[in-house]
Amino acid sequence: MSALEALAGRLHVEVRLQDGVIRAVDTRLQRPLPQISRLLVGQTAEAALRRLPLLFGLCAAAQQVAALRALERAAGWAAIAEVEEGRTRLGELESIRESLLRLVQVWELPVPLERLKALLALCRRAAARLQALTAFRAAPLPADAELEGTLAALAAAWADLQPPAPADWLRPRLDRWQEVALGGPPPQAFTADELPALLAQLRASDARAEIAGQPRLGGPAASAGAQATASAQIEQHVGALLRRTAQAIDSLQSPPAPPAVAGLAAGEGVGLARTARGWLLHRVCLDDGAVGTWQLLAPTDWNFHADGPLRRRLCGVRVAAGEVEALLRELILALDPCVAFEVKIVHA
């Protein structure tokens, strides 16, 4: 494994199967967050921001936006509304691009190649017009007719696409799991009301993705709900990703403000950015202009908690021995990790 692959992390899921029933699910997410933090601690805000693109492949723009918001807040500088709106647009454009690729490459959304290329090109073109806003303490951009025209073209191209409902194109893939009844309910969705509790944990050097010891879900994984069968669960996850893509395109016309984080101490900053998988959070403390503390929580940290949806929904589930690995892979893909994963089936 290369150094960059090690920094990306990896997901390991082990299932113990006995007499055709899943008895245990061990979800281990290896995320080298302490190593990433050490690469940023001691850096100035500007130097840390220059390092970030080298550390993250997926959700790179969202990582940049969340970090900018945290660093600027820690430095006591508030970006004006126009800058924040532009940064939100930048994150949403990345979310749209990554979601489209996921829908086509993983879930085989029937989109003509030329239309997909056109949508991705519009996302890239619009993002390039906003790139200047990734500077620390960025100034607002002048009125940009080309940007607005590109965003309008993106919305029109999406409307013209009229993607079908997941059940319409996934049916052969879903039919395989119609008889697999899932277990207990997944964790609750993480809400903005829980930010103060999460902040208290982070201040105590507890960066676990949970609230008061309980896991949470974020992004499309949270909105998919608890479905009775594996077939319906996968269908709802793909549908949630499709709806999130449409929502992101709609939001480009009037970008929402990120959730407010109250009660921050001097030199402390928290930044949030929405990704295709849910909210990304960075917490930074500056000491004499240099980074003293850097913490981050990504959607994958929440959605692949050891006591998260895989364990809660799969324990006690009856499935044929020859089908369990394929089922596990489909459910992992539905939860959409931002890291590579591997699965292991132990026959007890």
From Swiss-Prot:
Signal peptide: none annotated. InterPro entries: Ni-dep_hyd_lsu, NiFe-Hase_large, NiFe/NiFeSe_hydrgnase_LSU. GO terms for molecular function: nickel cation binding. Coiled coil: none annotated. Gene3D superfamilies: Cytochrome-c3 Hydrogenase, chain B. This is Hydrogenase expression/formation protein HoxV. The lineage of its organism: Bacteria, Pseudomonadati, Pseudomonadota, Gammaproteobacteria, Pseudomonadales.
